[in-house]
């Protein structure tokens, strides 16, 4: 379960970093930054809904390969 949480957190951080690079919000325009972060969070929730079941399905296979 800890591995799934770690993968999930890595995905969220990567998604936020990618979004910040692509959107390039300016520091003085706080409204744009807030909207960008809101979009990132809602996007991360959508990604998590797909990624968590995939992670749960893949984890036993990886455990068999490793162990």
UniProtKB/Swiss-Prot annotation:
Thermostable. Still active at 100 degrees Celsius. Residues 24-35 form a propeptide. This is Ceratotoxin-C. Keywords: Antibiotic, Antimicrobial, Cleavage on pair of basic residues, Cytolysis, Hemolysis, Immunity, Innate immunity, Secreted, Signal. It comes from the Eukaryota. Female-specific peptides with potent activity against Gram-positive and Gram-negative bacteria. They have as well hemolytic activity. The lineage of its organism: Eukaryota, Metazoa, Ecdysozoa, Arthropoda, Hexapoda. Homomer of four to six subunits. Residues 1-23 form the signal peptide. The gene is CTXC1. Its main location: secreted. GO terms for biological process: defense response to bacterium; innate immune response; killing of cells of another organism. GO terms for cellular component: extracellular region. It is found in: Secreted.
């Amino acid at each position: 379960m800890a591995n799934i949480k770690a993968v999930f957190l890595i995905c969220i951080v990567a998604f936020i970093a990618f979004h910040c690079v692509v959107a390039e919000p300016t520091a003085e325009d706080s409204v744009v930054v807030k909207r960008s972060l809101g979009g990132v969070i809602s996007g991360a929730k959508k990604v998590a809904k797909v990624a968590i079941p995939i992670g749960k399905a893949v984890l036993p296979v990886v455990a068999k390969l490793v162990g």
